[in-house]
Amino acid sequence: MAYPDFTLENKLSGVIAGVDEVGRGPLAGPVMSAAVVFTNRNIIIEGINDSKKLTAKNRQVLYEKIISVAKFGIGMASVAEINSYNILQATKLSMERALVNLGIELDYVLVDGNQPPKVKWQVKSIVKGDSLSVSVAAASIVAKVARDQLMQELHNQYPEYNWYKNKGYGTKGHIDAINLYGVTEHHRKSFAPILNSTKRALL
């Protein structure tokens, strides 16, 4: 398996943050982003990769290591904001908040994908950035673990939706629960499956 490295970071100068998001596709819960800066790139954490390629256990271990040596910020856009704007704009908003919460001045921002937020720093968009840049991959891990922890908390409020397992994604079990129990304030009512369920409930 190929792992990301600091090649992209080393081509640039100054303080560089990697940014990634998680939770664009789920039917419930916020979208979250993380920004990570490795001020010392000589520190090597083995195993850092795109969070989707890691097990939950490995993500947790790497998360603890990352936050112990790197500076990080986490940003969130709420379900209300997703419904009011759209998921793309809400995602950018969560990225902007993650960078603000990082709390340091930057020279460059490396963003996974091709839809970067509008920020005051120079931004470089990288398709599959979480497979190329250690900073972006680390951000994907921090964002994923943070969101999973939040979905566990929301699951404790509404256990019938199994959010601890599906993380709000539109699994068959989640859709069945929506049809049986209805939608909550944590569901994205602007998303088609939720919108259709709400319309059926009003018939």
UniProtKB/Swiss-Prot annotation:
One of its GO terms (molecular function) is RNA-DNA hybrid ribonuclease activity. It catalyses: Endonucleolytic cleavage to 5'-phosphomonoester. It is an enzyme of class 3 (hydrolase). Its main location: cytoplasm. Manganese or magnesium. Binds 1 divalent metal ion per monomer in the absence of substrate. May bind a second metal ion after substrate binding. Its cofactor is Mn(2+); Mg(2+). A divalent metal cation binds at residues 20-21, 112. It is found in: Cytoplasm. Keywords: Cytoplasm, Endonuclease, Hydrolase, Manganese, Metal-binding, Nuclease. GO terms for cellular component: cytoplasm; ribonuclease H2 complex. One of its GO terms (biological process) is DNA replication, removal of RNA primer. Belongs to the RNase HII family. NCBIfam families: PRK00015.1-1, PRK00015.1-3. This is Ribonuclease HII. It comes from Wolbachia sp. subsp. Brugia malayi (strain TRS).
